[in-house]
Amino acid sequence: MAEFNAMDTAAFKGVWVFCEQREGQVQAISYQLLSEGRKLANDLGVELCGVVMGSEVNEDYLKALGGYGADRVYYIDSPLLKDYTTDGYAKVLCDLIMEKKPEIMLIGATNLGRDLGPRCAARLHTGLTADCTHLDVDVAKYKDFLRTTSTIDVDNTKFEENTNLKMTRPAFGGHLMATIICPRFRPQMSTVRPGVMQTQPFDEAGAAKVVVEKVTPALTAEDIHVQVLDIKKSAEKLVDLIGADVVVAVGRGISADPEKGIKLAEELAGVLGGVVGASRAVTDAGWLSADHQVGQTGKTVHPRIYVALGISGAIQHVAGMQDSENIIAINKNENAPIFDVATYGIVGDLYKVVPELIKEIKAAKA
């Protein structure tokens, strides 16, 4: 293996995505990252590679990764990788990175990714930006992003013309957005939140031409210092906001009677076939658990219908739902910012409007 020097930036080329799989099923975040990685690779004029680890890896789904943008897929198949361990996965991924030298490494900000990413960054002596919500290498595209998401006077601000990865993430509890670069070290590493990147349509031609390459790992049982004895799935059922077709979200506007407000939201979600979401104010108050939270510090959703009940429309919340197909806002304040992004708006008391809405929907279904 050639000597690895994280500061020899010119030696690194290509965009990589760690494609997480569980029990033989590729996770949705992997397709999202491949779709985003494809854009970055196109802007840089380089190859996009997916990396898959596991035991008894199904080669059929490896080809499918090409349909979401991968030019090449490296896969590592070993009984020692059947269950995730920090030692095993970090060693194998770091060894491969040191050999192939990608300039960008993207990992999903899942429980697994949040453990694996920083471990690898530390071993490789490079930086990692966690929980990213936006990525750019093209300065012009980054400027366009800033024009729509910030108050920066882009046209009168000087930007360095380079292809460093610009990694944007929430900071200070979601009150600010910070863009971080890693100009002196490679690879540039980022973990990306599930749901913030859109998955591109499957491309049969891409799946047909992707190159699948098996890698034999230099991994032994002695390299793994933790033994997985058993895996138990949580009995707690978490709300699936990201996969929902309809989301009914509640905000600070339910503060007059939180219990009643949430009950109305649940009933409306029930008749619409959706799930209940919330703004940060609601989860911070303890009215709903954190898995219901939508926004920069919560989940990013793209449902067919998003109903905002008593949500003012703070930029941190809007960032997590503005790409919904149809946004219906109900708020007493006619000047609430939520109406700026709403497809349909109702100015009124949600405690009066929602029961009528539920009644009309039930009547229409009868």
Placement of each model-derived feature along the sequence:
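N-terminal glycine-rich FAD/FM-binding segment characteristic of electron-transfer flavoproteins
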Residues: 1-366
